[in-house]
Amino acid sequence: MSAVGNEPLARQALAFVLAGGRGSRLLELTDRRAKPAVYFGGKSRIIDFALSNAVNSGIRRIAVATQYKAHSLIRHLQMGWNFFRPERNESFDILPASQRVSENMWYVGTADAIYQNIDIIESHNARFIVVLAGDHIYKMDYEVMLRQHVDSGADVTVGCLEMPRAESSGFGIMHIDENGWIQEFLEKPADPPPMPGKPDVSLASMGIYVFDAKFLFDQLKRDAEDPSSNHDFGKDIIPYIVKNGRAIAHQFSTSCVRSGDDPRAYWRDVGTVDAYWAANIDLTDVVPELDLFDRAWPIWSYSEITPPAKFVHDEESRRGQAVSSLVSGGCIISGASLRRSLLFTGVRINSYANVENAVIMPYVNVGRGARLKNVVIDRGVEIPEGLVIGEDPELDAKRFRTTEQGISLITQPMIDRLNT
């Protein structure tokens, strides 16, 4: 089976993005927002990567299911993703949990999130449904995955990547035959099975699925009638198809969007504070694995109108400077030193402050003489003058949230408690 005429398969698809999760391992970073709404990379939110992949792949019909503390996410989507044109058969639907099936039921699983909106999805008359997780960082051409789905004749195509076994227990793990057909699918096993010939590696699901639309709707209706089901793709839908139908694996390495000749396939979960900090700080490398400067595959997002970043004062002990750092618009580095750090919009770092290995979210104000190292600072925090973080691990652990790798997470309530 081939595409209709020369029309890309992506133009016949609808992307359904699951964006309702909290991401509790991010601790206080998700106290006020869902994980897909967490800031990333200086200008974006995490969800922008899945959405940008869809748009860059040619998909022009998108639906986003939201649930946990969705206001920040919905506002971002309304401001940054409002460029779709219905007259061109484009659409962008935001679908908050709204008890559409029962007045006592919110979304109870990933599959249920689509089932509860099945009438809306069916109305778009898409040939394919591409199910996406809205909380991962990667660049991928979904057209390649759609092509494999059609050429193979599979009931479902599951995106997958090789992952160290030690890090795989939080993902669906699959075993495939020599042709890529999935023989077994285990959702989040405590002891992930290894790949044949690779004892330290498991084949993990990316939470990306391609279905023929009618087949998916039939599966969702069947699953909804099963009282023993969790109504979840990883726990129920995919294992059922593996057992009773045809499920094929799509290797991320074949559709990953790389920069130049870089052989690495970049994908990050950023599900913990340590992983989140590391993925952001990695962007300050001379040649980072994730290329945000790639004009051929841009990461679309809402961008505030701000003046350029400003660096002021040029005295020996009071010089506004930044080395190996990303500094967003509206920031002012006023006689302060910044090294290997990433600043989001509107951050101000005042005179004599020293900041190193820091991820600082929008509109943070760092007081004079502060010394900050190995930190993640939440939006809008006021850092007092002279505050020192990152030099005394025991003291940091008493005052802030510190991780196994020594990263301190700073929020305004933590700062407020310093004076009590």
Curated annotation (Swiss-Prot):
Keyword flag ATP-binding: yes
Name of the encoding gene: glgC
Subunit record text: Homotetramer.
InterPro entries attached to this UniProt entry: ADP-Glc_PPase (IPR011831), ADP_Glu_pyroP_CS (IPR005836), GlgC_bac (IPR023049), GlmU/GlgC-like_hexapep (IPR056818), NTP_transferase_dom (IPR005835), Nucleotide-diphossugar_trans (IPR029044), Trimer_LpxA-like_sf (IPR011004)
Pfam families to which the protein is assigned, alphabetical: Hexapep_GlmU (PF24894), NTP_transferase (PF00483)
SUPFAM superfamilies (UniProt xref): Nucleotide-diphospho-sugar transferases (SSF53448), Trimeric LpxA-like enzymes (SSF51161)
Coiled coil: none
Entry function: Involved in the biosynthesis of ADP-glucose, a building block required for the elongation reactions to produce glycogen. Catalyzes the reaction between ATP and alpha-D-glucose 1-phosphate (G1P) to produce pyrophosphate and ADP-Glc.
Catalytic reaction equation(s): alpha-D-glucose 1-phosphate + ATP + H(+) = ADP-alpha-D-glucose + diphosphate
Pathway listed: Glycan biosynthesis; glycogen biosynthesis
Protein name per its UniProtKB record: Glucose-1-phosphate adenylyltransferase
Family that this chain belongs to: Belongs to the bacterial/plant glucose-1-phosphate adenylyltransferase family.
GO molecular function terms attached to this record: ATP binding; glucose-1-phosphate adenylyltransferase activity
Binding site for alpha-D-glucose 1-phosphate: Y107, G172, E187, K188, S205
GO biological-process terms attached to the record: glycogen biosynthetic process
PANTHER family, sorted: GLUCOSE-1-PHOSPHATE ADENYLYLTRANSFERASE, GLUCOSE-1-PHOSPHATE ADENYLYLTRANSFERASE-RELATED
Swiss-Prot/TrEMBL keywords: ATP-binding, Carbohydrate metabolism, Glycogen biosynthesis, Glycogen metabolism, Nucleotide-binding, Nucleotidyltransferase, Transferase
